Amino acid sequence: MSRIDRALVSLDWEEHFENTSQRMLPHVILDHCPLLLEASVVRRGQSAFKFENMWLQAEGFVDRVQQWWIGYSFTGSPSYILAQKLKALNADLKKWNREVFSDLAFRKKNLLTKLMGLDAREESVGLSNEDQHRRIQLKGDIEHLASLEEISWRQKSRALFVKEGDNNTRFFHRLVNSRRNANLILYEDEANVRSQLVLFYQGLYEENEVWRPTMDGLDFACIEEKERLSLEKEFSKEEVFQVLKEMEGDKAPSPNGFTMAFFHKCCSIVEKDVMDFFDYFHRHSVFERSLNASFLTLIPKKCNAVNIKDFCSISLVGSVYKVLANRLRAVLDNLISESQNSFVGGRQILDSVLIANECLDSRLKSILSGVVCKLDIEKAYDHVNWEALFYLLGRMGFGSKWRGWIRVCVTSVRFSVLVNGSPEGFFGNSRGLRQGDPLSQLLFLLIMEVLSRLLKKTEECNLIRGFQVGSVNSVGVRISHMLFADDTILFVMLLEISFCP
């Protein structure tokens, strides 16, 4: 059903009224619906700490961080020490920002007022050499603050496609407002909605199935010995910090609040503690639970989302998963069948689209009957059974150390739900993978490989027969299914059923 009733606002309106919502009221007589345009202040809870990338441009910032970092003294495992140092730095940065860096907009407005005063004096009585020098300095300070403002708005806007130096603060500001309005959750009873969100995700991530089918009758590919050794080798400084450099500095921070830009700039300061953490994790397969905390960010899957199921949850996680994901991606090609092309190195998801289109074309040109069925698995990542995953890793030949790493990464997660920018709740889970985690999307490919192998086994037993691509009179290629992450397309011919002996 198309919408013909809309309320249009100007860009100036959007800048003055950031939290604007539109509601359609019931229509009684006319075909058109009355529209209610509400411009109100949204009640937001206390936001979590977020590192501001503009702080990195402050004079002497790195030296200041180094002094703080050296002064921290904690005892415990390397992961605990790293977590506590980041927490202490969090507090020092907030205090420094409040007392020294201060409010950027206020500072800029104050400088502009002084500059306007000098301009007015120049028109009336003229400026002395000292005043002219002061005006040049004021202009430089204002330009510097404008640059910091641009960095801040770019970070908030998530406009990663805009390169450094594209000085368009107004553009970034509008993007931030647009994101806030699109991701905003309006509610009548704040406490009730927050508690219901937490209860929903606690139930979603709780394993309540008492029985799951086994995979004993399916054949899986196995990794080679050299691949197993490559997965479990020690973490080098070059490997870890290359991953950090490749991660976008403006991307959303993890629950500790620090962006990748902080680690890029302060690499030499945190290097030892980060590598101690990775070395300890390599030897003992454990790390501090607080480093594995995750925010669930609710992203609307459609316009006018009103039900909680209309939102998909995306997790914001740390860089350790990126290191493991890079290693796992290197061995996936031999483990994943050709029916899956997403997230596998050397394969293109467009190939699956072309193959699916060829299957449809071949069926339309023939006189044979068939069925095309698209399966969309609801909350697929969230329903993954852990024991099935660990069993599958063993069947595919992964070593005990690697399986231990995956186990601790998957099972030690703690979640908080972000509601209008404010975290709510703190709970664990007993099933599921985190959508948005670079490692989880690869582990999910292995899970979906079970479905692919099951469909292949079904075809071998003549329970189904795929579409033949190519000439009907030639041998051609038979395609029974294509998998696109958590979406599956089946291509099945109509035939008489015969069962496996």
Can you annotate each of these PLM segments?
Residues 1-15, 49:
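Metal-dependent phosphoesterases centered on the DNase I-like endonuclease/exonuclease/phosphatase
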Residues 3, 8-9, 27-29, 37, ...:
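Nucleotidyl polymerases of mobile genetic elements and RNA viruses
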Residues 14-18, 42-45:
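Short helix-loop capping/hinge motifs at secondary-structure junctions, enriched
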Residues 17-20, 278:
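Short Pro/Gly-enriched beta-strand edge/turn motifs at strand-loop
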Residues 22-25:
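Short, P/G- and charge-enriched loop/turn segments at secondary-structure junctions
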Residues 32:
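Non-catalytic, usually N-terminal nucleic-acid engagement modules in DNA/RNA processing proteins
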Residues 35-187, 207, 212, 228-233, ...:
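Arg/Lys-enriched, amphipathic patches
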